[in-house]
């Protein structure tokens, strides 16, 4: 039987890290078993579902590279199918109309709470004969009485629920809109889902859904309920820990490979290995290797992984993601080096693409003034002679290459009998406006000959003015 999994988010908010991890695990379960992955949008909460959230979910999935084989399916477009099944269940007696008022239900719950009993529907309308009336009603599923629901969870092992602890679930509201738990069952059945991967907050839904599947004569999928993600302080993950939308991580300068690698390790492991390509994830992933314990979100670990991927992935590929940040920071690339060359030069120092973009501006744009602290330290009177001599040697070069530039800087230091820093630091501030850059040879090469010479001249004027002031 072909493995078929699904990711079924509700579009009441953006795709967050918890949902993204669930999507990844479900996607990997399909890919690791040469199966199929379905994307389903569970939008039956009409009041809270938004198109913006739907779009953000799709954008996040695409950015992560979690491609789907079917879908996206929308539950709101399948109401006719749900109502068809509800009608069949009413006719077969596996569901019934409940006419109990809100007041009666509230009073029942209050009495049960006062008596220390579990709050559940008492089956008042369960065996009433059909009636022809205009009274409002909900449709309830006739949950089995007695016995238990048992399933083997890939993550948690054997789980058992007593049917007596389950009440008769509402499967259609008074307005005729089918409920979440019912739609999920019909969808999983119709779409041939063989394995459901979802958060542990759905465990209590599982016995109810299994009972409905049995009533429909539908096959029961396998289940894997993954633990929640906590902040590094042990509290439930919130925005202050990093529970932001997936696309916010893109905006903050993370590569999808880094986020995927981080998320897969947030509860799953394969020996002591930390770095996983997507192909390796597919090769090694098993649901049974997911840890039952909650996992703590650690932003420092994510940053470390991001640094690794910025340095190790092909510069041309990193440049395709860096382009978004250059555009976002309004850096015009038309007058400067190829972006992949900048990635090669700056990757070693960069923690994020956002940071990398900001630090690359001087390759493409002239700066209005030197960094005040760096200029005060390095563009002093003592810097005038090194700057003038290195300017002469650079101007005399017959070719503008990294090797030739390096030799010119080295020859300047030798001729003046000073350390490289006495030449390099004033030159660095001169051409970048700041105190940090890659090697000066590659920096000047990428800035370009004309622009480098202009900036050195500007720095010489700056130093001369300081001497004369």
Swiss-Prot record:
Pfam families: Anticodon_2 (PF19269), tRNA-synt_1c (PF00749). Disulfide bonds: none annotated. The keyword Transport does not apply. One of its GO terms (biological process) is glutamyl-tRNA aminoacylation. It catalyses: tRNA(Glu) + L-glutamate + ATP = L-glutamyl-tRNA(Glu) + AMP + diphosphate. It is an enzyme of class 6 (ligase). Its cofactor is Zn(2+). Binds 1 zinc ion per subunit. Its EC number is 6.1.1.17. ATP binds at residue 239. Catalyzes the attachment of glutamate to tRNA(Glu) in a two-step reaction: glutamate is first activated by ATP to form Glu-AMP and then transferred to the acceptor end of tRNA(Glu). Monomer. This is Glutamate--tRNA ligase. The lineage of its organism: Bacteria, Pseudomonadati, Pseudomonadota, Gammaproteobacteria, Alteromonadales.
């Amino acid at each position: 039987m072909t493995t078929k999994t699904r990711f079924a988010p509700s579009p009441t908010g953006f795709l967050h890290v918890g949902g993204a991890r669930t999507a990844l695990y479900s996607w990997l379960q399909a890919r690791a078993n040469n199966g199929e992955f379905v994307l389903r949008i569970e939008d039956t909460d009409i009041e809270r579902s938004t198109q913006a959230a739907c779009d953000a979910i799709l954008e996040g999935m695409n950015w992560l590279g979690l491609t789907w084989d079917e879908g996206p399916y929308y539950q709101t477009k399948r109401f006719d199918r749900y109502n068809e099944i509800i009608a069949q269940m009413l006719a077969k007696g596996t569901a019934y109309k409940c006419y109990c008022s809100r007041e009666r239900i509230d009073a029942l719950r209050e009495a049960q709470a006062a008596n220390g009993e579990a709050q559940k529907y008492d089956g008042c309308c369960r065996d009433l004969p059909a009636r022809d009336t205009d009274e409002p009603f909900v449709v309830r599923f006739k949950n089995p009485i007695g016995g238990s629901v048992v399933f083997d969870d890939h993550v948690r092992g054997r789980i058992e629920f007593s049917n007596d602890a389950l009440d008769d679930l509402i499967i259609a509201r008074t307005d005729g809109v089918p409920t979440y738990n019912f739609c999920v069952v019909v969808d999983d059945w119709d779409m041939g889902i063989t394995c459901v991967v979802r958060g542990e907050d759905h465990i209590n839904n599982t016995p109810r859904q299994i009972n409905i599947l049995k009533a429909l004569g539908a096959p029961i999928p396998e289940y894997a309920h993954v633990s929640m993600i906590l902040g590094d302080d042990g509290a439930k993950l919130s925005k202050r820990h990093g529970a932001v939308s997936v696309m916010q991580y893109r905006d903050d300068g993370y590569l999808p490979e880094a986020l995927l690698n981080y998320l897969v390790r947030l509860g799953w492991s394969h020996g002591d290995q930390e770095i996983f390509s997507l192909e390796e994830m597919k090769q090694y992933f098993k649901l049974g290797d997911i840890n039952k314990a909650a996992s703590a979100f650690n932003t420092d670990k994510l940053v470390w992984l991001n640094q690794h991927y910025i340095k190790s992935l092909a510069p041309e590929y990193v440049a395709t993601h860096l382009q978004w940040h250059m555009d976002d920071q309004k850096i015009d690339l038309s007058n400067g080096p190829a972006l992949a060359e900048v990635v090669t030069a700056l990757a070693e120092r960069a923690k994020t693409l956002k940071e990398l973009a900001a630090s690359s501006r001087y390759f493409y744009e002239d700066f209005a003034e030197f960094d005040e602290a760096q200029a005060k330290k390095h563009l002093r009177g003592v810097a005038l002679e090194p700057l003038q001599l290195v300017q002469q040697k650079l101007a005399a070069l017959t070719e503008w290459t990294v090797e030739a530039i390096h030799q010119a800087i080295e020859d300047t230091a030798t001729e003046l009998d000073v350390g490289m820093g006495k030449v390099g630091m004033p030159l660095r501030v001169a051409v970048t406006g700041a105190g940090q850059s890659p090697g000066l040879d590659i920096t000047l090469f990428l800035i370009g000959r004309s622009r480098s010479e202009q900036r050195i001249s500007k720095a010489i004027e700056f130093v001369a003015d300081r001497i004369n002031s």
